[in-house]
Amino acid sequence: PYELTHQGVSFTDPKSRSWKYFSDIPYPGAPEHFDESFRIIAANIAADRSLATDLRAQLTTEAKASLTRYLAANPGRKTIRSHFEAVSSWAKANGIGPDRIFLGEFGVTRTYGPYKASPPQPLENWLGDVRQEAEARGFGWAFWALSGYGGMSLIETDESVAFDRPTIAALGLKSR
């Protein structure tokens, strides 16, 4: 779900432009997380003094709708499992072995330095759930990047060569 994986990322499309102001989005998510999550998003929008009043109102409305959709879906491991089971069924019906299914990217932006996005626990939960469900079916996977925009990477910060330990742990990798 992009509301989780791309929180803090700037988009121009009206359906996703409010995601720039998303941060601290829970995963797993549920409707009862709405009030706290929306309070954080609304505060992020209000803090952007570059926005005209009407645009601020539009972004708040768009963010509310997007967050509502995300949380109403109850995103969690069960959701991932359901999607991966559908892929497994399709592959089996078409004579494609699980070793030929490759998950090429499933990163999450994270909070550090100038970036305001996911805190460690939701990021670890998401990465761990996706990786474990893929591995349980024999699917291959790769992570987005060694370093890169908004912490969607294995490296701790933009200026660092040190691994981000929560990311490494969630991926089942070991670092020295």
What are these regions (language model features)?
Residues 112-176:
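Aromatic-rich peripheral "rim/lid" segments of glycoside hydrolase catalytic domains that contact
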Residues 1-135:
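Extracellular glycoside hydrolase catalytic/binding regions
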